[in-house]
Amino acid sequence: MFWKIIKEDLSQPKKQDPAYSGFLDVVFNYPGVWALINHRFAHFFFTHDLKWLGRIISGISRILTAVDIHPGATIGRNVFFDHATGIVIGETAVVGNN
């Protein structure tokens, strides 16, 4: 299930962004996608008794993507952060599907 959600995250630009121009474009030009994927890992560890590891992953992701998502936040499926720089999502936030 976890990897299926990651695959969905990687496919969102193609589905939702008219400026999408290929997978390499996602790799280099979509920090929101990478912030979300990093969050999925951080959230997993944060909610499985490894809060410290979730916080470390979240901190590194914040530095690399300029997107600050607390590892305790809940983010649904099929979410796409276009132009994500500067997004801040707190620990108690719940972002639904789609």
Regions found by a protein language model. Give the residues of each.
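Beta-solenoid/beta-rich acyl/carboxylate-transfer cores
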Residues: 68-80, 84-98
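Terminal amphipathic alpha-helical/low-complexity segments used for targeting or macromolecular assembly
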Residues: 1-61
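Alpha-helix boundary/capping detector
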Residues: 32, 36, 40, 67-71, ...
